[in-house]
């Protein structure tokens, strides 16, 4: 073997193609030839061996490269054979290393492999995309208004549109937002003005809150989702969002559909018009930071952990504030509102009735139950059984405590005077219970230990919870969801894991593992089984999500649909069909090529033209080279000989005459045409003459 060219300042000089190069990659030794490492131009290895990159050698003289040797092994195998064998290495890790080494053919092949499951049009569950709306003008009047009394009686200006707003890109929403920086949030964390902070839905309506304004969409059967309301720009970031889109009976007129937002201790309420537009109802003050904002029927409820609750009645147009014990949880069912407090008490409010005492104008708030251990009630769930008689519903309440306990209490309509009775107790959590859900078939609890979930199967008799055989343990799993420390992952209220869904149907958790993730995992709340996973179609991080139970079409045979709504960091909104995902649960996925099958197909072609380095390519297998898309000689042979009869010499060599190289040359010249039968040719002479001499055309090494 020829000696290598002398090195200059410790850098390997140019040597013969057959020179053996010793590498130390992350402590593991590899040996290969210079030709193998340098056949791709402008790569890390060609720069390294040409002296353009300084080298560091170990004690044995091998060139040291501080990279992962496990990932380097399939990369070196690709350089040797042009065939990719991942050898158990994850595709993203392999792509990252291929990009580091500058191996363009391998990078393109791996990028194509990644496109198997990625599409700008989403997958079969993707059902809609709403671009960012136009940034509204600033609200002119910021004086606090109570009830229907507005300044001058004029409603706030709103955007009226029945068509989809254009996506203006940098000239629209984001560009105008960057010109006018949004103020910092009350927590002092930086804000991303263009990202979706909160999403909520009710029936066929969606409300989307950005940093300083909100928009509402309505689903129409013929035209799809239409923008019907855009609020003025507010002074402070929106922290809470609530929407009610239908009140049974429709007796409230324009207040049948309302949307509300909270910023700090201030609450803004608008009435929505079905055909577009809206008017400001008023601005209300709770006096303390609003930590929960929701509708119970036509009543707007705002609560704070300090123990203050505010109620706005759509009929009386009255805003009332009441002090109770510090509130740690709440839930509503029908017209009942339950408040869990840190002293172990559960308070009850019937918001459907006139909620005021005539003598002192206080809310009718009464204590329903007190925890036996007086632990704080940190989670609440109310389940109303179907009416089995004229006496009313059987009320079942599950609650979690600050000590990790889970209790179920029940109250029969005939025993209202005696209060609820303790039914079951579970002590399976060692951290405070943060979420609890009692549904028709399951009891689900989540604690503060990385969202640890425990589930039980609930036995019922005639719709009522039964002790025979009683609740039985079902599953234990975790819904890991990390929160952002700098506020860039979205509003915490917009990333609630759930569970979502009706209490008489399968419910799901939505899992976003890291704050900047663009992929969400949908899992059954009862067992933790994965239903599906969705990835943002534009690659932007998901900053808010929710699940919407949408009314079915009026067409015969239609049924309600369940959608996953995802708000993105760039301001767009995507919709995913969870009904289809639930219907396909448990079915084996049927699709096209697997990753292995695709890689096998890609081995037959070059995805990157490398005409300048054809003469220095290593020798791949005959199958790979003969089907190469970039073999210039093969292409010209096909075009020049298409339709021409095969010469007798070619037929003779196909029958076994000549050397291996000669047969390969003849195959390339004739071109592979598997669909065309070979043209008959006379059998060559069987005499012992001199071997037939092939034409003078030369082939490069890739051709065989």
Swiss-Prot record:
GO biological process, one term: protein homooligomerization
Modified residues (Phosphothreonine): 163
Keyword Transmembrane helix found: no
InterPro entries reported for this sequence: BTB/POZ_dom, SHKBP1/KCTD3, SHKBP1_KCTD3_BTB_POZ, SKP1/BTB/POZ_sf, T1-type_BTB, WD40/YVTN_repeat-like_dom_sf, WD40_repeat_dom_sf
Domain of life, per lineage: Eukaryota
UniProt motif (PXXXPR) ranges: 618-623, 678-683
Low complexity: compositionally biased ranges: 611-644
Stretches for region Disordered: 145-165, 611-704
CDD domains referenced in this protein's UniProt entry, alphabetically: BTB_POZ_SHKBP1
Subcellular location: Lysosome
A GO cellular component entry from the record: lysosome
WD repeats: 233-280, 283-322, 324-359, 428-466, 548-586
Keywords assigned by UniProt, alphabetized: Acetylation, Lysosome, Phosphoprotein, Repeat, WD repeat
Chain positions found as Phosphoserine: 644, 646
Domain BTB, residue spans: 19-88
Pfam family for this entry, one: BTB_2
Record-stated family: Belongs to the KCTD3 family.
UniProt function note: Inhibits CBL-SH3KBP1 complex mediated down-regulation of EGFR signaling by sequestration of SH3KBP1. Binds to SH3KBP1 and prevents its interaction with CBL and inhibits translocation of SH3KBP1 to EGFR containing vesicles upon EGF stimulation.
PANTHER family registered for this protein in UniProt: SETA BINDING PROTEIN 1 (PTHR15859), SH3KBP1-BINDING PROTEIN 1 (PTHR15859:SF5)
Name used for this protein in its record: SH3KBP1-binding protein 1
């Amino acid at each position: 073997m020829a000696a290598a060219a002398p090195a200059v300042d410790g850098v390997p000089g140019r040597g013969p193609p057959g020179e053996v190069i010793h590498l130390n990659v992350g402590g593991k030794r590899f040996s290969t030839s210079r030709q193998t490492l340098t056949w791709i131009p402008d790569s890390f290895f060609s720069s390294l061996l040409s002296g353009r990159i300084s080298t560091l050698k170990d004690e044995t003289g091998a060139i040291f490269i501080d990279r992962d040797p496990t990932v380097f092994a399939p990369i070196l195998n690709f350089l040797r054979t042009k065939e990719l064998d991942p050898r158990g290495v994850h595709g993203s890790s392999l792509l990252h290393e291929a990009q580091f080494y500058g191996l363009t053919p391998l990078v393109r092949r791996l990028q194509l492999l990644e496109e198997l499951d990625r599409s700008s049009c989403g997958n079969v569950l993707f059902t809609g995309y709403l671009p960012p709306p136009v940034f509204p003008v600033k609200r002119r009047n910021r004086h606090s208004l109570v009830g229907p009394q507005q300044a001058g009686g004029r409603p706030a200006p709103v955007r009226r549109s029945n068509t989809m707003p254009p996506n203006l890109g940098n000239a629209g929403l984001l560009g105008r937002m960057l010109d006018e920086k949004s103020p910092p949030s009350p927590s002092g964390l930086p804000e991303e003005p263009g990202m979706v902070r909160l999403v909520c839905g009710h029936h066929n309506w969606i409300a989307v809150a950005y940093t300083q304004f909100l928009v509402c969409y309505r689903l129409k059967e013929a035209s799809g989702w239409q923008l019907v309301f855009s609020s003025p720009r507010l002074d402070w970031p929106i922290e809470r969002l609530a929407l009610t889109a239908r009140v049974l009976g429709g007796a409230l007129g324009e207040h049948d559909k309302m949307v509300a937002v909270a910023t700090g201790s201030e609450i803004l309420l608008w009435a929505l018009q079905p055909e577009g537009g809206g008017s400001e109802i008023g601005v209300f003050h709770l006096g303390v930071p609003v930590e929960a904002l929701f509708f119970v029927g036509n009543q707007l409820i705002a609560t704070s952990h300090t123990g203050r609750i505010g109620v706005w009645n759509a009929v009386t147009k009255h805003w009332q504030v009441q002090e109770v014990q510090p509130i740690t949880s709440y839930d509503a069912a029908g017209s009942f509102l339950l408040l869990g407090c840190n002293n172990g008490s559960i308070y009850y409010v019937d918001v459907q009735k006139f909620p005021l005492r005539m003598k002192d104008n206080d809310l009718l708030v009464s204590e329903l139950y007190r925890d036996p251990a007086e632990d704080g009630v940190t989670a609440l769930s109310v389940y109303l059984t179907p009416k089995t008689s004229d006496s009313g519903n059987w009320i079942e309440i599950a609650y979690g405590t600050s000590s990790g306990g889970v209790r179920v209490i029940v109250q029969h309509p005939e025993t209202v005077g005696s209060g609820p009775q303790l039914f079951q107790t579970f002590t399976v959590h060692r951290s405070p219970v943060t979420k609890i859900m009692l549904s028709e078939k399951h009891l689900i609890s989540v604690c503060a230990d990385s969202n640890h979930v425990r589930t039980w199967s609930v036995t019922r008799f005639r719709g009522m919870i039964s002790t025979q055989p009683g609740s039985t343990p079902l599953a234990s799993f975790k819904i890991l969801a990390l929160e952002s420390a700098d506020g860039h992952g979205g509003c915490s209220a917009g990333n609630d894991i759930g569970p979502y869904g009706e209490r008489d149907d399968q419910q799901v958790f939505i899992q976003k593992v890291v704050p900047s993730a663009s992929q969400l995992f949908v899992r059954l709340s009862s067992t933790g089984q994965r239903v599906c996973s969705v990835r943002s179609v534009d690659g932007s991080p998901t900053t808010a999500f929710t699940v919407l139970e949408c009314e079915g079409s009026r067409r015969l045979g239609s049924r309600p649909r369940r959608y996953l709504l995802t708000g993105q960091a760039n301001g767009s909104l995507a919709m995913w069909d969870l009904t289809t995902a639930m219907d396909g649960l448990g079915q084996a996925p049927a699709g096209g090529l697997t990753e292995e099958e695709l890689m096998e197909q890609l081995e037959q072609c070059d995805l990157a033209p490398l005409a300048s380095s054809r003469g220095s390519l290593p020798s791949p297998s005959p199958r790979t080279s003969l089907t190469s898309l970039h073999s210039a000689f093969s292409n010209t042979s096909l075009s020049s000989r298409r339709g021409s009869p095969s010469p007798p010499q070619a037929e003779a060599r196909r029958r076994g005459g000549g050397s291996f190289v000669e047969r390969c040359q003849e195959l390339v010249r004739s071109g592979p045409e598997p669909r065309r039968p070979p043209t008959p040719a006379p059998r060559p002479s069987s005499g012992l003459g001199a071997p037939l001499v092939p034409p003078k055309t030369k082939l490069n090494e890739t051709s065989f």
